[in-house]
Amino acid sequence: MNRIDKTLEKLKANRKKMLSPYITAGDPYPELTVSLMHQLVKSGADVLELGIPFSDPMAEGPVIQRAMERALAHSIHCDDVLNMVRQFRKTDTETPVILMGYLNPIEQYGYDLFAQQAVEAGVDGTILVDLPPEEADGVSRVWQKHGLYSIYLCSPTTSAERMNYINQHANGYLYYVSLKGVTGSDALKLPELKAQYLQRKAQSKLPLMVGFGIKTPEMAAQVAEFADGVIVGAALINEIIEAYEAKKDPLQASGALLSSMRQAIDNIGSMV
């Protein structure tokens, strides 16, 4: 069984919500990434999302764009990201790792070789932001051959027809984009988000995890009251880079934010 499914089953059995942090591989410097991954697990992460740096990250706001620029300045590419996962797997064989990014670097790498190398390194799935599910058949077949999960995006504007298609092809869970815009956006309106989320939830055969715009423990808990889980990216990267630039400890800063989110989410009580 894929580590993602094992984790989701465990969360359901324990009546807990998923917490998934996102970091960009190689940001702020390559040697920190594996230690950050371990720190985030220690601080309550259920699933790790590791970003593959890309020069044109169209879905990202300025925080993650700058993170990718810093990583690319260190010449971080697919092989480097896979090596980071290999290092992580030496001491953590249970926490799911999802690679999140864009199609171009993987296409250049070669789909079959990438999937083979990713699974060998210990990757459990991918989120390819610019690959619509209707155009993903070729990639999906290769991923299935190697046992790599495809995590798809859905949003308030996703049609019922597209949700039906996603239901036929997705694995693990869906990444629910909470609002129109880019990562790190400010305009999260909870009543509207809840209503739209519940519409998509009713159409989905898989758990829906909410990302985009979740910045504080309070906001994470409010979303987790109705959602299957939350994903935090830009807020976490802000903590990491601010600590690094202030010559403080990025591990402590990122761990403190994630721990507070974990506690806030767990304090909402039983799953609804």
Curated annotation (Swiss-Prot):
Keywords: Amino-acid biosynthesis, Aromatic amino acid biosynthesis, Lyase, Tryptophan biosynthesis. CDD domains: Tryptophan_synthase_alpha. InterPro entries: Aldolase_TIM, RibuloseP-bd_barrel, Trp_synthase_alpha_AS, Trp_synthase_suA. One of its GO terms (cellular component) is cytosol. Pathway: Amino-acid biosynthesis; L-tryptophan biosynthesis; L-tryptophan from chorismate: step 5/5. GO terms for molecular function: tryptophan synthase activity. It catalyses: (1S,2R)-1-C-(indol-3-yl)glycerol 3-phosphate + L-serine = D-glyceraldehyde 3-phosphate + L-tryptophan + H2O. It holds the Pfam family Trp_syntA. HAMAP family: Trp_synth_alpha (MF_00131). Tetramer of two alpha and two beta chains. Belongs to the TrpA family. This is Tryptophan synthase alpha chain. The gene is trpA.
